[in-house]
Design a protein with these regions (language model features):
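N-terminal intrinsically disordered, cationic/polar leader segments
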Residues: 2-147, 151-180
Length: 180
């Protein structure tokens, strides 16, 4: 059984955490500010540079919220301090992506270019025609934008063409063999 909720969270230098009475947590750091409201069942305490998360009862839902709250808080602190980044790769002949202002334009085998608008708080870059870098301070939003980009053309199992994460392994299938 996981004990994620019982682990303490260390607050690095340059990051400030403000906990309001209604369990709204504001985390400010060199990269920006994140605000989130947590369940009143969970108590969040800060003592100097250490944050602890505790639950009021041993109910199953409270145990689940305990671990989730701790993980979300740790991600908020890491995001404003270091930030998050997801890298995608475009595989396929003639497939490419480029930025036009705040819009990512993908030419990936459809009869029309696919345009994806950038979100507030998330930066999309194209260091080359076949590489896309999504970065920001919110792990959730960075992952969501990267997933939306990948969803436009998922990698197919026969040739591996499509948009994939850099560290993703595509399970390949063998094509049909010709009959006699």
């Amino acid at each position: 059984m996981s004990r994620v909720g019982n682990k303490i969270i260390n607050v690095p230098e340059g990051v400030t955490v403000d906990i309001a009475a209604d369990n709204t947590v504001t985390v400010t750091g060199p990269k920006g500010t994140l605000v989130r409201q947590f369940s009143p069942v969970i108590t969040i305490k800060q003592e100097e540079n250490v944050i602890t998360v505790a639950r009021s009862t041993e109910q199953k839902t409270h145990k689940q919220l305990h671990g989730t709250t701790r993980a979300l808080l740790a991600n908020m602190i890491e995001g404003v301090h270091v930030g998050f980044k997801k890298e995608l790769e475009i595989v396929g002949i003639g497939y490419r992506g480029q930025m036009k202002g705040n819009t990512l334009v993908l030419n990936i085998g459809y009869s029309h270019p696919v345009e994806i608008e950038g979100e507030e708080g998330v930066t999309i870059e194209t260091p080359s025609n076949t590489k896309i870098v999504v970065s920001g301070i919110s792990k959730e939003r960075v992952g969501q934008v990267a997933a939306q980009i990948r969803e436009v053309r998922k990698p197919e199992p026969y040739k591996g063409k499509g948009i994939k994460y850099v560290d993703e392994r595509i399970i390949r299938k063998e094509g049909k063999t010709a009959g006699k």
